[in-house]
Amino acid sequence: MANGVKLEPLYSIKVVCAQCEHEYLTSRVRPSFKKAYRTDTDFCAYYKTENPDFYVVRVCPECGFASTENSTLKLNERQITLFYDQVGCRWEKRDMGGPRNLEDALESYKLALLCAQVIGERDRIVASLLHHIAWLYRYQGNEEQEKRFLGYSLESYIRVFELEGVGANDARLLYLIGEIHRRLGQFQEAIQWFSRVVQDEKIMDAAMIRASREQWKLIAEQIREQKNAAIQAES
């Protein structure tokens, strides 16, 4: 609080649309409010006030093109045509730049996903959008849809790995692939990815190495619990 004025969590930034070049305002959460009180093992964070993830996607009110700050900065002619034919021609002008609730955030992410798929956006962008949608369903308590989109994000993350390979800075990608496998109950696949993080000498990310070891240990406990439950069910 400065001079008796209470600082609001949201502020506006100007964005130039990558599709139609229209300049518009979209909301962001101030850094001082980005303090998660809890974070899941796949980096899904929880906040007491505004959730910054609700505002990652910016939506052009003029044409409906939705993207993130990491998306393509300017579409080429082919991408513009693809977008208009499949998305833009049906857009009804409206402003999504203000405060967002969970449903608004979900709508913005799904629109961004559609736009990304239509224009052939990079796999890393698509994977991140899919993963964020899974988080939104987790906030909502919709486990079926959460797992559905975790599965989609897993496929995309693996495609990123296959196309780009892995370097010393990609421990987080390998860890995420392993952790999503674990969350989907695919324990053996998860172990294979966690082991890459732990055993690859090129990887120097101590936090991801430690996290991979912890989740590997958790899998062993989960498998043991499953076996004990099966034995009890038979007796």
Protein language model regions, located:
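Flexible helix-coil transition and linker loops at the boundaries of alpha-helical arrays
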Residues: 97-98, 112-126, 158-168, 202-205
